[in-house]
Amino acid sequence: MAQSSPQLDIQVLHDLRQRFPEIPEGVVSQCMLQNNNNLEACCRALSQESSKYLYMEYHSPDDNRMNRNRLLHINLGIHSPSSYHPGDGAQLNGGRTLVHSSSDGHIDPQHAAGKQLICLVQEPHSAPAVVAATPNYNPFFMNEQNRSAATPPSQPPQQPSSMQTGMNPSAMQGPSPPPPPPSYMHIPRYSTNPITVTVSQNLPSGQTVPRALQILPQIPSNLYGSPGSIYIRQTSQSSSGRQTPQSTPWQSSPQGPVPHYSQRPLPVYPHQQNYQPSQYSPKQQQIPQSAYHSPPPSQCPSPFSSPQHQVQPSQLGHIFMPPSPSTTPPHPYQQGPPSYQKQGSHSVAYLPYTASSLSKGSMKKIEITVEPSQRPGTAINRSPSPISNQPSPRNQHSLYTATTPPSSSPSRGISSQPKPPFSVNPVYITYTQPTGPSCTPSPSPRVIPNPTTVFKITVGRATTENLLNLVDQEERSAAPEPIQPISVIPGSGGEKGSHKYQRSSSSGSDDYAYTQALLLHQRARMERLAKQLKLEKEELERLKSEVNGMEHDLMQRRLRRVSCTTAIPTPEEMTRLRSMNRQLQINVDCTLKEVDLLQSRGNFDPKAMNNFYDNIEPGPVVPPKPSKKDSSDPCTIERKARRISVTSKVQADIHDTQAAAADEHRTGSTQSPRTQPRDEDYEGAPWNCDSCTFLNHPALNRCEQCEMPRYT
């Protein structure tokens, strides 16, 4: 990364960092060095470079192999606060630097100008990690056989990559010799533990067996610059097309202070058959028993090849590496190729961290699992592998990072190698941090307060939903990344010659990313519209059924109303009406016969009985008193008439007349005992009023009803 040197003007650097926050500090520092701290020249150059980081497809202008190697450098080193200063950029940022390298071989920041490591993370100038480190201090405290972790192994620096126990030295393949060892200045404050993880892509896609890469951090020195670095590289398939790019315009200074002793990287145990024996020392057979055991060779069918290390997306791999004591932003949006990490509204929090959490007993483990690929994604969800000793970052962290862009994508400026049959798609990494107790800082670096902790990082393919969530997070961030078509960006992305690949050649990948994002957006919109259309169709069908039901009910009501007015009676109804009519006629005939029978018996006049009270005079006219022999006859006749009328109302046949006659005969028989002396006979017989015919008590002289006198 870019180190602060006396040639840099801190004020100009600060102004440029404020003006171009999307450009990493290393690139800004290199621009200042090239332009001799000229603010205007740096502004012009950085304004041209800013779009590369805005559209997140940065590549070196002379890098004609942008699809081949995408180096992801995960820095796990620790540093002391005294060595931290703002000019160091990502070198002293707590060891969490993601580095984009255009080099093709092993990581060699000083081997050639084109192999400089470009800072990918722009770290804020916050409180650095507080670590008390010694020159020979190994932060991972992992012992080899009969050798302490703090003792530097006696390995000559002529081997840039050395395998330890568990490697099969004859399993390496590839003719490319190791690059010359880099020269670094030794700063004893740093304890470097390099972990170079290179995963191979040129594996047959039919293999689905899980493979594991075990990395044992037992060497307290670093080959590649920053302390405790982990480099994850994806390179192309053909080694014939390996080219060393020319000097990049933004060259960075050496990665970090590295001691010259023990130039051995951490061991890699993939148990495969494609290694370079020239790059790995067979004498490192000193750790037969390690803290972690890799699976047998049958389960690890060569996931890695030495010259070009790429991972097949459809296969599963495991990488075990120790954690770093620093923290990372929770949701930064970053992509690997542009060497740019968007800070947005998130800031990197540096939490105080002491070496006590990295003591021997507290050996922590990070497990990186590469899952089978689901679909080509345009961004990866990368989460922080390092941890902090505070419980604040124990939740799920998600970063969106894109490594190598798909080599099968259109308008990609590649001329020196054939296109692979599959595309190198971004990797989707999720990080789950265990919920164990946090390490308590202690003054002694050897004190262990917590047991072994395992950190799992799952590497898979980014799905559509992940990109949608990424867009949602970008909407909530301070500076969302614009997506513009290729027509907006100057230069054509379809150029095939590497000499034409200037700054504007990133427009091809921009156009591809824009196309992918547009397709994803349109697909999501189409799905949403299809769902809405389905709901509308269901609602339409429901309304149609309701309308049909209402129309049917209306028709039924109309039919019932019409049938009530003009309906022809049924034969049953006609028969019923005919029988009722016949019954009425029978009743009328019976009534007439009864009337004729009663009329033939005497002075029974129904008309006179109905109008009886109309013939009564209004005044107290006393009728002439009837004779004694006829006095009883009217009463008897009247009683008979009353009884006959009542009987005729109840019975409606001819036999009623016989019953009436029998009743009349019975009445005559009942009147015969009344003639016998009873109590009433002593008082006298009741008398009928001549005016109102009311039957009065014999003791009364006036009528009880009309007050007419009994006798005139």
Curated annotation (Swiss-Prot):
Residues 322-332 have a biased composition (Pro residues). Changing residue 703 to S: Disrupted zinc-finger; abolished methylation at C-692. Residues 141-189, 227-345, 369-447, 475-509, 609-636, 658-682 are annotated as: Disordered. The keyword Phosphoprotein applies. Pfam families: CUE. PANTHER family: TGF-BETA-ACTIVATED KINASE 1 AND MAP3K7-BINDING PROTEIN 3, TGF-BETA-ACTIVATED KINASE 1 AND MAP3K7-BINDING PROTEIN TAB. This is TGF-beta-activated kinase 1 and MAP3K7-binding protein 3. It comes from Homo sapiens (Human). The gene is TAB3.
